[in-house]
Amino acid sequence: MQNKIGQNMKDTILEKSKELFLRNGFKTVGMDDIAQALHISKKTIYQYFPSKEDLVKATLYYVYNLAFSKIAEISGKCETAIHEHFKIKESIDGILGKDFETSPCFFQLKKYYPELCYEFEKKRCKDVKNHIENNISEGIKQGIYRENLDKSFLAVQFIAGSDAIDLYEAFPEEIGKRISIKEHDDKFLEFYLRSIVTPKGLEIVENLIKKENEI
């Protein structure tokens, strides 16, 4: 019983930390802010997370596990491998929330917790690469992706392209035209899929984009 109560409190702290960190950033939000939002003492938080870095790490992997449990839930259960991409994108957007669009959280993670960020990125890239390779295999079987695609190469390019919004900072003349994270993700997914689909797959991509635009 005591363990269950303790786990419930830990989960409550992680859920509130997720909300605040993703909205305002890992550096900006302090232990005081989380304690105040939960109406508990900092001492209670420190019982479960001995340091701010411990809480940042736990929250980061809490969000990651939420996202990948959704991916696992969706994978292989959609009408096609293309539908799977769109469904996962929608689900991840729901987990991150609308405030993520303007949040400095991952910029702050890289700047203030570089070792943690490096460790996290290694895991994320490995898991995403495996998922994309599996998706490509399924799409080829379904006749919607071209045969003889280099799955490993494409998976790495998918990860690089998904993260490429950070490169806007390298083009000062484009800063005023910087697109949102959602718009970047939408445009990149379309670009990626158009580069690998068959005519049958292209029809599915265009229909799904049309449906999204009608919402």
Walk through the language-model features, giving the residues of each.
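N-terminal intrinsically disordered/low-complexity leader segments
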Residues: M1-N8, K210-I215
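Helix-turn-helix
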Residues: T12, K16, L20-D54, A58
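Hydrophobic alpha-helical connector segments
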Residues: A58, A72-E101, A155-F158, K182-D185
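Short, basic, alpha-helical segments at the C-terminal edge of helix-turn-helix-like DNA-binding modules
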Residues: L60-F68
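Short secondary-structure transition hinges
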Residues: G97, E101-N134, K141-I144, L149-F153
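Short linear capping/connector segments at secondary-structure termini
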Residues: C105-Y113, P172-I175, N207-K211
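C-terminal peripheral helix-coil segments that are non-catalytic and often amphipathic
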Residues: N134-Q142, I175-I215
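Membrane-embedded alpha-helical segments of multi-pass transporters/permeases
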Residues: A164-E169
